[in-house]
Amino acid sequence: MDSAALSGFAPAACAGFLPAQDAVPCSHAVEFYQDRDAFLDGLSDFIRSAIQSGGACLIIATESNRQAIALRLRTSGVDLPHAVQNSQYLLLDAEATLDRFMVDGWPDSQRFFATIEPFLMHAKASLGADVKFPVAFGEMVAILCADGHFDAAIRLEQLWNELARKHSFALRCAYPSDGFADGTRGKDYLARITAEHSHVLTA
């Protein structure tokens, strides 16, 4: 999916994953990607920037993507054991986290807040003196869409936005673009998901 396919959908667009120091509190950005490796490269750069600037990251991702991110961070010189020990690099499994707040195929708002808020607060408490807010990446919405639960994914995006009205953090999420290839239906869900974000990130 190229940037032209997103025209008219996005409140704003920017190239790639913004460096963490350029993110703004309560921003909620989304990337629709075709190339997984390129996506992971950009996401890993975003996380590395946050860690090296004294920030803290909450990463909610699948096991395969957590491993791929860790490899990229180590290769780029990030001391992951140190980051983990200092709570700058907080990891949650996306599927296990979903299981904690999904009820009958739908995100339960109270369970969502009870699940995510403590980790956000922990990340905030781990920030360096000159860092104002943590950053987060969430892959749970992509899992819901991959399983055909598009409406539940949209509701989860809305819950993240509700959380952002209570806490300052910068959120990134991402979807494989081939999940929206189903003609008019796919285009409709693409527009609705995009509308829940402040930025669309393009390669």
Regions found by a protein language model. Give the residues of each.
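Non-catalytic regulatory/interaction regions at protein termini and inter-domain linkers
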Residues: 1-203
